[in-house]
């Protein structure tokens, strides 16, 4: 289950046909219904010509049913799954430029150096949403120079064989 989200935040996994206007159609439909998209991540799926969207939207359970029905009307949408209450793998990524003096402390917390420097260093950190959120808070305390954070990438866990 995705623990870092509140009751009002739902996580949808949407398989779509690749197309230049697909992202616009999906987000436009959600926006027209008055829902806030907190995060969106899009990338190629394992199937040629198709992409996987992960959407984090502010909506309750009943409202998500409305969103699903509207998304299903779009020709480009092939499959929709609400992953909010499922056992999933969920990862986010943060890339940051920080003062070189704080790098050892951040590396001890799991960060990896991408580009070392004498004054500033570029690092990355990946983890679940709560971990990444806590890491970003640490960066703020250290007076980070620049931060970029991805949206969630979410995949349902496979059944465990015992």
Regions found by a protein language model. Give the residues of each.
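Long, contiguous binding/interaction regions
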Residues: 1-11, 15, 19-51, 56-162
């Amino acid at each position: 289950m995705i623990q870092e989200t509140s009751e009002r935040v739902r996580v949808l996994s949407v398989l779509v046909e690749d197309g230049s206007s697909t992202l616009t159609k999906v987000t436009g439909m959600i926006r027209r219904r008055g829902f806030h998209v907190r995060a969106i991540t899009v990338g190629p799926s394992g199937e040629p010509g198709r992409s996987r969207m992960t959407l984090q939207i502010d909506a309750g359970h009943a409202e998500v049913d409305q969103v699903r029905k509207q998304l299903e009307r779009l020709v480009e949408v092939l499959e929709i799954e609400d992953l909010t209450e499922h056992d999933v793998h969920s990862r986010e990524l943060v890339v940051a430029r920080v003062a070189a003096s704080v790098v050892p402390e951040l590396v001890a917390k799991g960060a990896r150096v991408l580009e070392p420097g004498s004054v500033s260093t570029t690092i990355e950190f990946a983890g679940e949403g709560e971990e990444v959120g806590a890491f970003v808070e640490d960066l703020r305390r250290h007076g980070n120079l620049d931060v970029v954070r991805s949206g969630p990438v979410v995949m349902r866990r496979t059944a465990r064989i015992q």
